[in-house]
Amino acid sequence: MSLGLLKFQAVGEEDEEDEEGESLDSVKALTAKLQLQTRRPSYLEWTAQVQSQAWRRAQAKPGPGGPGDICGFDSMDSALEWLRRELREMQAQDRQLAGQLLRLRAQLHRLKMDQACHLHQELLDEAELELELEPGAGLALAPLLRHLGLTRMNISARRFTLC
């Protein structure tokens, strides 16, 4: 959320609720447009449980303390236990994804290093080839090193022979 969209209003004004409702409606519309759905099995189980007959019967009989009273759960403790289990599963998934992202980052870094080394080696090979093929470069070095018996081709290969 950018700072340009923030509006400061007095406490108790209802415009904030309307904006929240509008943003929720826009998120729901975007979700429907992109056909996004939650694929977590626990969420699907919960929605099936909520939409089941036991839930509808509990809605029809407004008796407090009855089974299925709290969002399709028998009691608050069972609802909290389900929520804790879900959070533990989500934390495990988060750790797994974080490890996967770190491995991908390391692989990407390794690939970048390999590519940089390969490009550097190509530049060195190209410069060496230019020195070998350039006619003036060999003549400039020839008088200085000819008395030692060094040739132009042997200098670039780093092997020195006597003539």
Curated annotation (Swiss-Prot):
Parts forming coiled coils: 73-132
Lineage: Eukaryota, Metazoa, Chordata, Craniata, Vertebrata
Family recorded in the similarity comment: Belongs to the FAM167 (SEC) family.
Protein name: Protein FAM167B
Source organism, top-level taxon: Eukaryota
Keywords noted in UniProt: Coiled coil
InterPro entries reported for this sequence: FAM167, FAM167_domain
PANTHER family according to UniProt: PROTEIN FAM167A, PROTEIN FAM167B
Stored Pfam families: FAM167
